[in-house]
Amino acid sequence: MSEPRTGHYLMGKLGVYEVGQFLGQGAFGKVAKCSKLGSNECFAIKIVDDMEAGVDEAKAMGLIKSLDPDANNLLKFYESFKHQDYMCLVYEMLDQSLESFMRKNSFRPTHLCGIRAIAQQLLVALNALKSIQVFHGDIKLDNIMMVNQDSTPYKIKLIDFGLAMDSWDMELGTTFQIVPFRAPEVSLGLPLGVSADMWAIGLVLASLYFGRLPFTYDEEYDTLRCVVQWLGLPEEKLLNRGLFSTDFFTCDEDYSQPGWRMNSPSEYSKITGEAVRRLHNIPGLEDMKNIHKNIFELFDHDDHQTTEKVEEEGLHGPEAAPDQTGKRNQATSTSRKNSCKKNNNYNRNPSPQSRRLQTSSNQSGRGRRSFSVC
């Protein structure tokens, strides 16, 4: 069957749509701006070429539709239908993604008032999803849209629920999220929850604050090296439980101070067979903060402290939650005693080869997920 093109018509349940300009392309399909015949309405229609993935997303949106999308800053979903071999999902038309907004502004740091507004809206969205036990799984700059930056500045909505899953269905060791936004618990193979979405939100806010992605690397090891430099080693109890901890860390039991340490680049390459880039002059967290302060000197010290606190809470710990942003998980291990104790229920590291196969099939953070609707 031929792929839908500009000028083609799509027969939905709620009307007939004429395909206009294509706005973007993802792992499973394209998004087109479409006009509804007989009206002046425009919609964003996601045309998915993987039928199973399209059906999964439609099921997820059916559940999310029970929430008030405007009050909870979630993309409004209208209908889904099949067109030949494609699944079509009809969404409201929005303005631009945060990534496009940053690009248009030459990646200059965003004012704190804008960051604060975006943070509040994202936490409302995440809390709404948590209330129905849904995990987004792909929060990044491209998946946060501004509604209309000219008429309603910094009003945003969370979009793209193609990877959304029921929190009860998340399997231990599942790999998702693109690497620059991937939470440490995903890389380490720890039990998953809303904290992974919280981590991604922290990185979105940090990107707006700094005018650049904090972690720009495509390999998990490189990203984790930066995380450790900024926040210190993960807690020993987390490293003890991680399915993939020994890909990235080694537990030294024979030294005078036994405990976990990060593998050197050569050790990591030997374990996984993956090359590691040489990282030079990784900016520290304080250096990155000063970039923003030097640009916006008119904002007072309290504004910066408040924003930095929210960002840091988003970047800490599996216990972080959207309705408990004041509760921080301690990222740095405080004791190295008995740090190499293993929990046999969790420390089942598969071979590096099997992990690489899982990760390589998911480089874009995309993967087919089951989504049960009760």
Range-by-range predicted roles:
Residues 19-27, 31:
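Protein kinase glycine-rich loop
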Residues 118-119:
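Activation segment signature within eukaryotic-like protein kinase domains
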Residues 185-196:
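Conserved end of the kinase activation segment
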Residues 235-317:
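C-terminal lobe substrate-recognition/regulatory segment of protein kinase catalytic domains
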Residues 130-148:
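Catalytic-loop of the protein kinase fold
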Residues 68-79:
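Conserved HxN/HPN-centered segment at the entrance to the catalytic loop
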Residues 83-92, 99-100:
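A conserved loop-to-beta-strand element in the N-lobe of protein kinase catalytic cores
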Residues 142-179:
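Activation segment/activation loop of eukaryotic-type protein kinase catalytic domains
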